[in-house]
């Protein structure tokens, strides 16, 4: 089944399968299924076309998903960088923006280690 341009896994429960759509987490998935009246424990393969269509409608009218959600997030980060606030500077320098320590951690954000050559020991005669 395809919703919002994403192929949902047929063998998973509806709640879990909906979280494969960017911009929909577990809480949003539960709310969507509750509004449509579908049991969250049902598998995606068990849903009929009418139920799938109603899920598509709810997502289209109430949620920002996939490309639109990614674009909005990129724009908000770009706005922070443009206004020059602290969080924007941290994004620009590829450092953690939420106050984490960086002396020993933050390898994911900083990337691979850039080796700096140490002092060479003087040869004693």
UniProtKB/Swiss-Prot annotation:
Region annotation Disordered: where it falls in the sequence: 92-125
Compositional bias ranges of the Basic residues kind: 107-125
Pfam families given in the database record: Ribosomal_S13
Secretion signal span: none
One of the GO biological process terms: translation
GO cellular component: cytosol; small ribosomal subunit
Domain of life: Bacteria
Classification via SUPFAM superfamilies: S13-like H2TH domain
Subunit structure as annotated in this protein's UniProt entry: Part of the 30S ribosomal subunit. Forms a loose heterodimer with protein S19. Forms two bridges to the 50S subunit in the 70S ribosome.
Family stated for the protein in its record: Belongs to the universal ribosomal protein uS13 family.
Matches recorded under NCBIfam families: uS13_bact
The protein's name in its UniProt record: Small ribosomal subunit protein uS13
Organism: Chlorobium phaeobacteroides (strain BS1)
Name of the gene encoding the protein in the UniProt record: rpsM
């Amino acid at each position: 089944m395809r919703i919002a341009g994403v192929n949902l896994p047929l063998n998973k429960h509806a709640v879990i399968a909906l979280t494969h759509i960017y911009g929909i987490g577990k809480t949003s998935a539960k709310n969507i299924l509750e509004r449509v009246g579908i049991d969250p424990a049902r598998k995606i393969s068990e849903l009929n076309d009418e139920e799938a269509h109603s899920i598509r409608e709810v997502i289209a009218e109430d949620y920002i998903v996939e490309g639109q959600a990614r674009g909005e997030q990129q724009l908000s980060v770009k706005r922070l960088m443009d206004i020059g606030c602290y969080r924007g500077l941290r994004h620009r320098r590829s450092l953690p923006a939420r106050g984490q320590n960086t002396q020993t951690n933050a390898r994911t954000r900083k990337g691979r280690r850039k080796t700096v050559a140490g002092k060479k020991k003087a040869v004693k005669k």
